[in-house]
C-alpha cells in the first residue's frame, strides 16, 4: 500500500473531499485506511466495564486507500507515490518533488 500508519493524507473523493488527517490504522487485506477526523460515523455503545455511561459515540470509519493521497508539505498538495532503491532499501518517493517520504 502507498500509505503507512502516521502519514498525513488528503481525501480526494467522497463527502470528506479536501480534508487532511493522519492515518490511524491501515487495513491492507481490505485495502482500506482509517484517517483521523474523516468519515465520522455514530456508533451506539452499550454500557460496559470501560465505558460505564454508554450512549452514542462518534468514531472514524475506514475508507478505501485509493481515495487518499499523501500530503507533501513542500508541494503543499497531495502527491502520488513512487518507489526507488536507496542503499539497498526500497523507499517511497514523491512523484511531484522527487523527495524521499520516509
UniProtKB/Swiss-Prot annotation:
Keywords: Ribonucleoprotein, Ribosomal protein, RNA-binding, rRNA-binding
A GO term, aspect molecular function: structural constituent of ribosome
Record-linked SMART domains: KOW
Keyword rRNA-binding carried by entry: yes
Residue ranges crossing the lipid bilayer per the database entry: none
Entries under InterPro entries matching the protein: KOW, Rib_uL2_dom2, Ribosomal_uL24, Ribosomal_uL24_CS, Ribosomal_uL24_KOW, Translation_prot_SH3-like_sf
GO biological process, one term: translation
A Gene Ontology cellular-component term: ribonucleoprotein complex
Domain of life: Bacteria
Family according to the record: Belongs to the universal ribosomal protein uL24 family.
Subunit structure: Part of the 50S ribosomal subunit.
Function: One of two assembly initiator proteins, it binds directly to the 5'-end of the 23S rRNA, where it nucleates assembly of the 50S subunit. One of the proteins that surrounds the polypeptide exit tunnel on the outside of the subunit.
Name listed for the protein in its UniProt record: Large ribosomal subunit protein uL24
Amino acid at each position: 500500500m502507498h500509505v503507512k500508519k502516521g502519514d498525513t493524507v488528503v481525501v480526494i473523493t467522497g463527502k470528506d473531499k479536501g480534508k487532511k488527517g493522519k492515518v490511524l490504522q491501515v487495513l491492507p487485506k481490505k485495502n482500506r485506511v482509517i484517517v483521523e477526523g474523516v468519515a465520522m460515523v455514530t456508533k451506539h455503545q452499550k454500557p460496559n466495564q470501560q465505558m460505564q455511561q454508554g450512549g452514542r459515540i462518534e468514531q472514524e470509519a475506514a475508507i478505501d486507500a485509493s481515495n487518499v493521497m499523501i500530503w507533501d508539505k513542500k508541494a503543499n498538495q497531495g502527491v502520488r507515490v513512487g518507489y526507488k532503491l536507496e542503499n539497498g532499501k526500497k523507499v517511497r518517493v514523491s512523484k511531484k518533488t522527487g523527495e524521499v517520504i520516509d
